[in-house]
Amino acid sequence: MMKNVADWIDNVLHNNAVPTDIVAFCFNLYEESDSSWAMELVGTERFDLEDEDWACNEATDFGSRENLYNWKMECEWDEALAYLVNELKQYLSSGKYAELLKSKEGVGVGFVDGNIEILHSK
């Protein structure tokens, strides 16, 4: 397991090319079990600030579905989301692949069955 979110993102994007048809990125979150959470990164062929279903137009998961970022945290789902929002905002400000992520139309994060929080849009 990667020691932190930044290392995990670096590993995913270092080992997987971004297809040319990708217009946005979404970090999908899952509640695995009590106090156990997971995240994957997908690239989408669509982005729309007015329609959260853009994240359903997945073109690739960059292999992250087989290599999820997992963490343990005793909290409610909204606290897990807030933790990841903070981590991802830090990454987008100074991470190794921050400019690559921000070069597309948008970057979002959210639970697969919930709302998406937009972290960056052009």
Please provide the spans of the model-predicted regions.
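Aromatic/basic-lined ligand-recognition segments
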Residues: 40-42, 55-59
